[in-house]
Each structure stands twice: as structure tokens, then as C-alpha cells.
């Protein structure tokens, strides 16, 4: 993910080499940029790529640098932005859509507004700013100043005002840093450690540990010689530092580490103790996969990739191309990409088997890469011919469903729980372990979970996000409770590190996770999804379908076949709406008829408003399902949009997607009232054309009470169903599985509202 910073490299070897054979060609496009395009990064929230051209339009570097902006949807140049002199690095805050560029010779940082690609501010920092990192939670940017005088420091930039608010002194010749947003700590690598000025015989390097709450250095850790790159695994709380000189205190005076065995130091973030492992000759770059708990190091002299197991610190070696430079990993597919500088290729490696599955021809001298896991694209910067190669990623794994009797995995409420998640922080939960503890079944083979997520805010909750443990927090929300109500929302969430999921709460809130099934690789007992045009199967209003349900009394429904649900269905995809005549319902529980009522909730309503929630419900004997309102009478609406059954004609599999925002009407006006069409396939999320159904999280932001919102397939008649309700006028979310036939869907709002659609997966053959 990060190479050795270019200001440290004295010589870039440009040697002729034979191109390796290509096993599978996945080059999609080649985009021209400008001179010395050493670094690039993508904003996963907007699907825009930013390429840093250190020398701008002048190959002799006598002008300002530039940033080339590439539209990731069509792979064309959208803009070229002038920045300062000798720019070194850029970082993106996807939450604010701002890009920060360090200008080494100007001692400044250029701030680019990603909405209009203009420099909105230039911030003075310390001497020779280089590497930087951003904390998207606190909206602070940390800049390494490694020059003399004002150097040997970190500048802290407030992303709200884009002003430098603090300068923190660190060790000698700081070269890189990494932020842990979970613990609000910053780790700074000091190349020369405690020795002022570097020489051929220098002291070991150090890492300065900064507390982001008060900008103070709270610890200093000694690492190896010539440390350059640092990564933080915020799941295991381990920090990894690449030492280019390894255990050798006498690197060549020009910093040449060609024939020196590099090492990696693992720091325990709690105790600040260290362990060190050997890698290979001529370290070039390092990357981290927190989901797989693995660290990757390219070794440019012996043309290998070292793979470190974060648990055991065992090292495996993979042969790659000639003079490997950057290494990147797609944590969503566990695929590794290595830039082979002299071979003009990229090695594609399966992270599970460490087998090279493809070698792809790219441009001349590929030196840097970036993975956008949201759209499964890889971008490669070729400095030999000033281009960017766009590669497609490895296809996601097809998954099928295994229903589970609804079961409570987690409840943070005291006395049995660990207490609420503090506002502005996240926690990671190991669901397979929780499932064993709670007797919810064996989840060891689960790749993704079908959950019902309930929030119990202490006051109000701006938003909550749930995502795979070890992955970066996506710029989406799972649910909101701006009115402070207890709310539930269904979610299909892939498992991350050891099957874990992470949960972020913008404000302090308790969280409840109930499971009703999981998705895994196809097998003898797994089920495919069969889509249906949304259809209403139960409406108890006006004394229909048994009339109003009574508090504390179970009501059973046999799922009829008139909506296309066959007797072979083993689970149903419902949207359930509760309409209590007066007072709060407290909660409603839905489960397979014939089994004991589980201690779970399917939806919550403690104020008496109309509430909808999606639910995947296993089928009971004779296709019967049980419904239980806890504390009040209620009418029910039950809509079905699909079912799960053994494999057959028309059956679809789930393909999980790193959450991606398909549309946010707040960006283009006042929202809508009535019907609109959303072109999902042509959105920035780059979804495939064969998707048979989309898994959305739909959110409305109404200015006043909203009776209902309905989503349905484009090209079909609007069904008599609803997706969600916001009768109280507050922000409301609900999961929705919407069938697809032509890449678009329709949305109907009964009154004016803004709408946000985030996608977390799709069903396809």
C-alpha cells in the first residue's frame, strides 16, 4: 500500500527485462496522466481516482505538480488540478470528500474539494512535508515534516476549518505515519531514531506513539534499522514497521538496501512490546490485510513477496516479477497485487493459497497501485510512460443461504452486556464465538450473515454502521435514530477477521444483533434465492386475515401461494409493517411455526408510530410462520419479495458488495414527491448487468411525516406494497431486496422526501 517514500529513494533503477507471460488479461483501460506519477489514491465513496504527478507538465520538474482526477465509472480524465512544488503524497477523507496534498518544497498542504476539483485552501505546515494520514472519525489530518528546523515534527490539521492547529515534536527524520481511528492513536516512524542527523552508521529507528486526544507523545518504541513504512491493524491492535536495513546498523551511506535482509517489527499496541521477523533482500513496499491478519512485503532484490502471518509471525515467500515495487490487497476478495517495475506487469496472487493466478501486462515501469474494493478495480501508476492502468478484480464468490432459527447473538445492555458503544467509536464482535456462547449454532462456514440490528440509544443516534471486521469503515449508514427511538433494521453483512463484524455508533447506543441465517459457499443443504415482484400476502386492517393481532397472543400464518411462493420454500424475504392502533407495540417477534418462541425481536415500536422492517424468516412446517406482538395490539402488513429454496431454474446466488452509495438525492436538490427511476447499473458502484436483484439499505430524510416509500423493479406496475414508513417525520431506514430486470428500479414517495440508497450485495445466477 505504501512504497518507500520517493524522497528517500536516491536512484530508481530503469533496467530492461523480459515481460512475464500473462495468465489472464484483465486490463480494462489505460489513462494518460502527467510526469512522475508516483502516487495515486481513490475515494471509494465517489469512485474518483486522484493521481499525483510530482513534476506536472514538465519532465524536468521546473513547474508545480498536478493531480489528475480520473472518473472511475468511464476511466476518463475529469480534471487536472495544479498544486504546489514537488508534491509527495495525498490522502482522501471520503467522509468530507476532500483531498490533501503535501508539497515538499513549498512546506504546504493543498486542499482539493472533490466536488468541483478545485484547490480551496493552501495550509502552511513544517519543513519538507511528506507522508500524511487522515482520521475520518475526528476529521484530523496528520502530516510528517522531516526537514531541519521545523522538521522532525507532525503537523495536525483540523479538517473542519482546514487549518494547522498543532505541531508535535517526534524523533529524528520522521518518514511515515499511520492512524488508528479506533483508539485515536498515531504512530510515527523516525528513520534515524534518537540520533540527530543520519549517517552510514546510525542508531536504530523508533516509532513515536501520539495520543490523538491531546496531541502528546505517550511512548517511543525502538524498532530496526532504516524503518520506512508503518501500518496499524486496529482489530488485533498490532502495529507493523518495515525496517529496510533490518538488523544491519551500517546501511550504505546513500541508503541503498539492495543486498540487505530487511525485517518487520510487530508492536503490541497495548504493551508496546516488539517482535521482529526477517523478510527478503531490498524491501520496497508493505501492505496489510486485517481481515486475513496478514502482512505483505515486496523484496526488490530477490524478486519475491514475503507474507507474514500476524498471529504466528511465520513467513512464506512467493516469487513475483522483476524488481517488485508496490503491493496492494483487496481485502474483500483476499487478492494481492504486486507491481513488477522491470517486467511491466502486475502479479495477481490468491491470498488464501498464495498461488499466482494471473500476470497482467500494464504500462512501462509500474511503481504504485491502489485497490478500490467497492467497485473491485485496481489502478496501477506507470512512471515510465506516464499512464494509469485500470484492472478488473477477481470476481466475488457466489453464496447460498442457510436458514437459522432466529437467535440473539449480542445484547450490549447491562447487566448481561458489556455496555453501550460510546459515541464516535466502534467495537468489533466475533460472531462465530458469540454464536457458540449463545447456542445459536455453528457459524464457522459463514461468509455473510443475515442479521436484525436493533439500536437502543441513550439519547439520540445520528447513525450506526456495521461492516466486516478488519475492513475500512464504509461511508454509508445502516440505520438512524435521530429521535432517540429504539429501532431495528435488517442487514446482510459479510464476516471479516475471524468472522467478526465492526459496529460504529455516532452517538452512545446499545446494540442488539439477532441472526436468522447465513450465506456460505454452495453445498448440499444450501438454498438459492428466487425473486418475486413485491406482493402483499397479509393485511389485517378492516378485519382481514384474522384482524388485529392482540398483545401477548401468537398469530400463525400459512404463507399462501397466490404471490408465487411455492411449498418448497424454506425461508421467506418479508417486509413487515406494524400499525398499532394506539400506544407503543414494544416489539414484534417472527419465527418458524412449530418451534419455541425465540428471545429475539423482529421490529420495535415504542412510540406507536407505523414501523416497517425487512426480515428473512425460516419456514415452519406446512409453510407456517408465527407472529407475536409483545405489549400492544397491532395490525400487520406482510409483503414478500422473494424466497429461498433448493437449487432450481431461476435460482440466484448472493454476491456480497462492499457497501456503496447508489444515490443520494440530497446532492442534487430537494428530493422528490411521487415516482422517480434510479439507474442502478450506471451508478458509480459498477454493478454487473446480470444482477437479478439488489440488496439495498433505503433511507428517507423527510421534511415532514412521510406515509410510505415503495421500491420496485423498473418496467413493471407499481405494486400495492410499501418499503418503509416515516409517519413521525424522522430519518428512517430499511433493508430492501428489489428484483431487477433492466438495471433500473422505481421509487415512489407519498410526499416530499430525500432518499439514500446504499447497496451491500446483489443476487445473480
Regions found by a protein language model. Give the residues of each.
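Detector for methionine-enriched segments
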Residues: 1, 48, 261, 283-286, ...
Amino acid at each position: 500500500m505504501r512504497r518507500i517514500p520517493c524522497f528517500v529513494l536516491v536512484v530508481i533503477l530503469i533496467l530492461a527485462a523480459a515481460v512475464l507471460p500473462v495468465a489472464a488479461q484483465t486490463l480494462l483501460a489505460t489513462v494518460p496522466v502527467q510526469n512522475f506519477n508516483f502516487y495515486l489514491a481513490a475515494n471509494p465513496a465517489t469512485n474518483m481516482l486522484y493521481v499525483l504527478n510530482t513534476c506536472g507538465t514538465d519532465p524536468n520538474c521546473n513547474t508545480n505538480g498536478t493531480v489528475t482526477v480520473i472518473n472511475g465509472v468511464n476511466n476518463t480524465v475529469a480534471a487536472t488540478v495544479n498544486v504546489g512544488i514537488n508534491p509527495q503524497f495525498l490522502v482522501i477523507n471520503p467522509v468530507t470528500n476532500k483531498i490533501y496534498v503535501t508539497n515538499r518544497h513549498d512546506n504546504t498542504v493543498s486542499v482539493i474539494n472533490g466536488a468541483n476539483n478545485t484547490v480551496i485552501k493552501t495550509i502552511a505546515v513544517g519543513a519538507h512535508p511528506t507522508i500524511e494520514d487522515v482520521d475520518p472519525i475526528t476529521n484530523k489530518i496528520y502530516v510528517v515534516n522531516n526537514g531541519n528546523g521545523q522538521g522532525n515534527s507532525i503537523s495536525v490539521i483540523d479538517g473542519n476549518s482546514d487549518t494547522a492547529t498543532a505541531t508535535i515534536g517526534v524523533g529524528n527524520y520522521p518518514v511515515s505515519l499511520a492512524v488508528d481511528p479506533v483508539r485515536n492513536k498515531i504512530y510515527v516512524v523516525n528513520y534515524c531514531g534518537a540520533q540527530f542527523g543520519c549517517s552510514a552508521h546510525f542508531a536504530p529507528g523508533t516509532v513515536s506513539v501520539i495520543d490523538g486526544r491531546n496531541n502528546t507523545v505517550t511512548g517511543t518504541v525502538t524498532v530496526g534499522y532504516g524503518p520506512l513504512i508503518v501500518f496499524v491493524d486496529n482489530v488485533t491492535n498490532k502495529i507493523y514497521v518495515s525496517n529496510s536495513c533490518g538488523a544491519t546498523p551500517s546501511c550504505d551511506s546513500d541508503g541503498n538496501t539492495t543486498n540487505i535482509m530487511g525485517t518487520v517489527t510487530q508492536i503490541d499496541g497495548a504493551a508496546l512490546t516488539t517482535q521482529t521477523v526477517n523478510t527478503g533482500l531490498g524491501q520496497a513496499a508493505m501492505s496489510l490485510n486485517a481481515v486475513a491478519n496478514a502482512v505483505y512485503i515486496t523484496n526488490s532484490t530477490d524478486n519475491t513477496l514475503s507474507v507474514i502471518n500476524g498471529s504466528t509471525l511465520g513467513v512464506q515467500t512467493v516469487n513475483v516479477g522483476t524488481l517488485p515495487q508496490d503491493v496492494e490487497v483487496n481485502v474483500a476478495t483476499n487478492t494481492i497485487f504486486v507491481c513488477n517495475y522491470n517486467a511491466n506487469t502486475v502479479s495477481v496472487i490468491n491470498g488464501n493459497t498464495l498461488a499466482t493466478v494471473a500476470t497482467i501486462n500494464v504500462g512501462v515501469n509500474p511503481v504504485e497501485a491502489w485497490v478500490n474494493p467497492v467497485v473491485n478495480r485496481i489502478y496501477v501508476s506507470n512512471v515510465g510512460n506516464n499512464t494509469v492502468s485500470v484492472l478488473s478484480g477477481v470476481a466475488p464468490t457466489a453464496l447460498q443461504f442457510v436458514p437459522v432459527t432466529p437467535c440473539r447473538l449480542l445484547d450490549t445492555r447491562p447487566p448481561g452486556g458489556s455496555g453501550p458503544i460510546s459515541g464516535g467509536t466502534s467495537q468489533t464482535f466475533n460472531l462465530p464465538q458469540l454464536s457458540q456462547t449463545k447456542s445459536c449454532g455453528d457459524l464457522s462456514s459463514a461468509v455473510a450473515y443475515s442479521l436484525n440490528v436493533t439500536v437502543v440509544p441513550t439519547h439520540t443516534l445520528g447513525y450506526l454502521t456495521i461492516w466486516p471486521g478488519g475492513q475500512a469503515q464504509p461511508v454509508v449508514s445502516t440505520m438512524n435514530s435521530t429521535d432517540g427511538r429504539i429501532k431495528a433494521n435488517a442487514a446482510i453483512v459479510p464476516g471479516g477477521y475471524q468472522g467478526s463484524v465492526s459496529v460504529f455508533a455516532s452517538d452512545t447506543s446499545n446494540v442488539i444483533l439477532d441472526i436468522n441465517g447465513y450465506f456460505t459457499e454452495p453445498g448440499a443443504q444450501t438454498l438459492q434465492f428466487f425473486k418475486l415482484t413485491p406482493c402483499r400476502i397479509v393485511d389485517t386492517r378492516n378485519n382481514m386475515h384474522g384482524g388485529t393481532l392482540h398483545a401477548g397472543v401468537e398469530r400463525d400464518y400459512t404463507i399462501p401461494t397466490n404471490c408465487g411462493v411455492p411449498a418448497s420454500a424454506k425461508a421467506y424475504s418479508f417486509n413487515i409493517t406494524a400499525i398499532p392502533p394506539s400506544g407503543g407495540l414494544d416489539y414484534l417477534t417472527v419465527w418458524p411455526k412449530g418451534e419455541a418462541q425465540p428471545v429475539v425481536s423482529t421490529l420495535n415500536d415504542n412510540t406507536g408510530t407505523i414501523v416497517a422492517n425487512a426480515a428473512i424468516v425460516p419456514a415452519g412446517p406446512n409453510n407456517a410462520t408465527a407472529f407475536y406482538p409483545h405489549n400492544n395490539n397491532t395490525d400487520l402488513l406482510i409483503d414478500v419479495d422473494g424466497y429461498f429454496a433448493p437449487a432450481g431454474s431461476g435460482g440466484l446466488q448472493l454476491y456480497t458488495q462492499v457497501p456503496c452509495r447508489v444515490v443520494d438525492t440530497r446532492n442534487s436538490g430537494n428530493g422528490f414527491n411521487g415516482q422517480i427511476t434510479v439507474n442502478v447499473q450506471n451508478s458509480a458502484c459498477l454493478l454487473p448487468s446480470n444482477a437479478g436483484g439488489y440488496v439495498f439499505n433505503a433511507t428517507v430524510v423527510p421534511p415532514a411525516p412521510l406515509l410510505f416509500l415503495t421500491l420496485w423493479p423498473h418496467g413493471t406496475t407499481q405494486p400495492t406494497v410499501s418499503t418503509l414508513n416515516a409517519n413521525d417525520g424522522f430519518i428512517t431506514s430499511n433493508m430492501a431486496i428489489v428484483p431487477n430486470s433492466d438495471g433500473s428500479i422505481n421509487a415512489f414517495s407519498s410526499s416530499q422526501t430525500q432518499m439514500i440508497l446504499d447497496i451491500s450485495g446483489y443476487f445473480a445466477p
